[in-house]
Amino acid sequence: MPNFSYSDLLPLGADATKYRLVSTEGVSVVKHGDKEFLQVESAALVKLTHEAIHDINHYLRAEHLQQLTNIVKDPEASPNDRFVAIDLLKNANIAAGGVLPMCQDTGTALVMGKKGQYVLTTGKDEVAISQGIYDAYTKLNLRYSQMAPVTTWEEKNTGNNLPAQIEIYADSDHQDEYNFMFIAKGGGSANKSFLYQETKAVLNPTAFMNWLDEKLRSIGTAACPPYHLAIVIGGTSAEATVKTAKLASTKYLDSLPTTGDAATGHGFRDLELEQKVLELTRTLGIGAQFGGKYFCHDVRVVRLPRHGASLPIAIAVSCSADRQAKAKITKDGIFLEVLETDPAHFLPETTDEHLNDDVVAIDLNQPMAAVLAELSKHPVKTRLSLTGTLVVARDLAHAKIKADMDAGKPMPEYLKNYAVDYAGPAKTPEGYASGSFGPTTAGRMDSYVDYFQKNGGSMVMLAKGNRSKAVTDACKSNGGFYLGSIGGPAARLAQDCIKKVEVLDFEELGMEAVWKIDVVDFPAFIVVDDKGNDFFASTSTPLTINTRPEN
């Protein structure tokens, strides 16, 4: 008979996180018999949650900021790598002012709590945490992104960014503590969480790296690299594998053991494989969105036990808006992870002018034919500086325009006369022309492109991420262009580039309305041109699932 042996599946080491004291109110120690209990008032949970949501939308970890600085200083980084890194550092400095959030997609609020067995609370914890999320999203300049299902087919924005994902677990290792992880997860990076059901054929170094090369290329740039990449191999269930990948991408699992154990089967980090995967990402050619070396800042690889008949593998990313913070409540008070509130010292002396002299200025207020003629002179990957008027339209606006055209209405003149930016702003602070304003994922609008262009609209499109071959074919056939906008620096765009915003159509759609904006020196790159060239075509391979790799 085998011996009984137990280990936590994810045995974490000591917590080295630096915390700051938020408050001592609402926390006390009470005795029941000979036991001491930590009593936490609901108000303390509300306050902690509000503070956490504020901080993770405005501040980043110092380690993340240092990684951006390292890109700028790396002589092997491409000019486009360095440009993106500097723009993200500028964005971090603006967001740290506490007014404009770092990204316009202020995310779904995710809260994981681990409640010690000697912790007492005065109400339902999920209600108090939800109240804190509500307070943060309604009082700060954040965006409401949650869609409530009214029927199976009909949805309505909840108008307060609730509901949140809240998961609370019992914790016997920290009996008189309440520990938390707060995450603001935007749609771009959430959509790049993948589960693959593979076989043991993948479990050798050559086969795995060949398999992974293909899968990493398929991630593309829609989730705003440079990424913190997480890969989990194995798992007791598919859902456990994906959840572990999400936690690994936040660095929550960094203190895992670095070797396995045949007796208990606990998970561990493979540091050697992490380095090999990081080296692989630097050869893909994708870089920090528009070509180069820095597709990823770093990599985490976690190996988990598995059923002999199953091999789930999960891939997840945390994006350039690397938004999470740990927190804890102890007898000493309420504590929140220390994030960098003064990131100015991470900005290097390098200026935009030192990065690349080949920046092409585009006057968007010319007739569309003149804009197209100017763009046609330049190859893909060319960096642009856009000045003039853009219209902004994303998913719901495109659907409504298509429905109107199907009903016999003409293509709106604004889509014929102006370049269209796929975006949606956060709330506009008092005294600002715009709230945080950045691109959404272009691929969701791919099905409209050929039809719209054949009717004279969407000839110049601006968004983030790679697109399907159908868009490349449409642009070649119709003479159009797709320009890549940097994913991530939404606060900088709002403060420095956007001078005027007004609703143009479908006002009832809120942030998904059609907007007209005036921009100055708005950065972009040519990704797809009118000759059938696509920057991303050289960096991608067809995606296969559950295919036996070459050994």
Tell what function each PLM region has.
Residues L375-H378, L384:
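Short, well-ordered loop/turn sites that connect or cap secondary structure elements
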Residues G292-V299, R306-H307, D496-N551:
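C-terminal binding/interaction regions
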Residues M1-I231, T236-L355, G435, Q453:
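Non-transmembrane, aqueous-exposed alpha-helical and coiled segments at domain scale
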Residues D358-A370:
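Short, structured beta-strand/loop micro-motifs enriched in basic residues and often containing a Trp
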